[in-house]
Amino acid sequence: MTPLIADEVHVESPEAAVAPPSVRLDPDLLSDIKRFGAADVSACFSCGNCTAICPLSDGDGTFPRRMIRYAQLGMKDALISSKELWSCYHCGTCSDSCPTQADPAGFMAAARRYAIASYDRTRLARTLSTRAVLGTIIALALAAFFALFMYASHGVERASRLALFDFIPERLIHLTGVVVMSLVALAALVGVASMVAGIARREGVRFRDVLGGPGAWGRSLRALWLALGIEALGQRRYRNDCGEAAEAEPLYRRRWLIHALTLWGFLGLFLATILDYGLALIGVKATGTPVPIWYPVRLLGTVAGAAMVYGATLLIWNRLRRANVTASQSQFSDWLLLALVWVTGVTGFAIEVALYLPHPPTWGYWVFLVHVAVAIELVLLLPFTKLAHAIYRPVALFFHALAGTRTAESN
């Protein structure tokens, strides 16, 4: 058995494995994280088995062992400022091999929910993660509010063609979207600023290390490419290192692919929406006008929507049948995100079908109303649900890649 190692708390010897005097401790940290779905990791005696078996753990990322020690010691700032917290893809290998069944994988997932709530100043993320009943009420109330808000300004339902933006004015949707996106951007910026400040302080990264000259620019651009292009979008380590246990699964059911299709689909739909509005602004086509399926923006939206619905459907199915560690540990916030993503995608396809039918169905107007309300809610809740991973994980991966780049240059 390995003793409590020094690098867990950055001290010199196992006997000194306590937090430095200058570190502020939170004695309620571990019990608070349990409210976000963590198991009782007090059973963990730091044997190091989880770190040894984790395919992603390396000299600069001794997780989940280090994260668990932070929680046990009450080192909140160290925990939520750890880039390693976001490097984990929750494959469950560590929990399968834990000799005390402390469930380190479940702890890491709960710690990420806790970190999202800690970055959020509104406490909405905490409510959605820890209070299922109230969270359900909030989600339903938001959807109802946006639906009623849109319906209050609805126009005529035309029988000759499906004129969606005569039913709900396009300008109203656009202005509502701008307001919602502004609020989301503000919440995301506050959260990311808090995260970046904490990680930079822990990693000893200063402004000049990132943007202080040609050498720093080169390192930062390389780290950005590794974080966004290779890991966040390409999911290289998730696909190559974390997928070994799932090799028996056919490709279309592998977790990395399901996760990637859901992410790529969401981003593709977001891009298609922006392009559609952009083309409308420059007079190329009116928003919502039926066009051939091979029209570039329409094709992008169709392919992206199919990918998102496919990924979300399999994620829901895996959770219903508790197919893996991640599925068996789903919390309300996970279900809420999947429900919003799935409804947005399915209603979007229903609208597309209705637009191309020879005789426009009146149900298309009501599906459109639901689609708009849920889509706006999905975007509004982005910084407060598991979808916030799309914001915070790339930031953590950037610092992880930057540390690797700096280490390589120093050797």
Regions found by a protein language model. Name each.
Residues 1-85, 394-398, 404, 409:
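Ferredoxin-type iron-sulfur electron-transfer modules and their immediate structural context
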Residues 26, 64, 104-108, 226, ...:
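Alpha-helix initiation and N-capping motif
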Residues 34, 61, 79, 90, ...:
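Short hydrophobic/aromatic segments of transmembrane alpha-helices and their interfaces
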Residues 41, 58, 68-278, 282:
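Iron-sulfur-cluster electron-transfer modules
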Residues 46, 72, 90, 309, ...:
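Short glycine/serine/threonine-biased micro-segments
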Residues 123-130, 166-172, 207-218, 246-258, ...:
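Membrane-interface segments at loop-to-transmembrane junctions
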Residues 136-151, 178-195, 258-281, 294-321, ...:
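Hydrophobic cores of alpha-helical transmembrane segments in multi-pass integral membrane proteins
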Residues 202, 318-325:
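Juxtamembrane helix-loop transition segments at the membrane interface in multi-pass membrane proteins
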